[in-house]
Amino acid sequence: MDINQVAMEVILNAGDGRADIELALTSCAAFDFDGAETHLKDAEAKILQAHNAQTETIQAQAAGEDVEYSLLFTHAQDTLMTISAELHFAQRLLPVFRALASKNA
């Protein structure tokens, strides 16, 4: 297992998820809730891919495989954790925007 390759997979998928979160928030601000939901689902799928790559690495090490320390992998985990929190926050904002839209209608 090339730990740096896995790290890049995590970073790239999480980063793509972050881009979808930004699109979702832009859609929310424009009261395009269907678009926001679509972007959030896309973000969730990409973050899941990143999470799965991370989990496979952790499980391999737990099973006894020698996994060398990698600062890049640590950065990837930090990136994934941060973007996962952003996704959770964006998912919680969608109903708030919907409530605001219904009160202003």
Regions found by a protein language model. Give the residues of each.
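Terminal alpha-helical segments
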Residues: 1-105
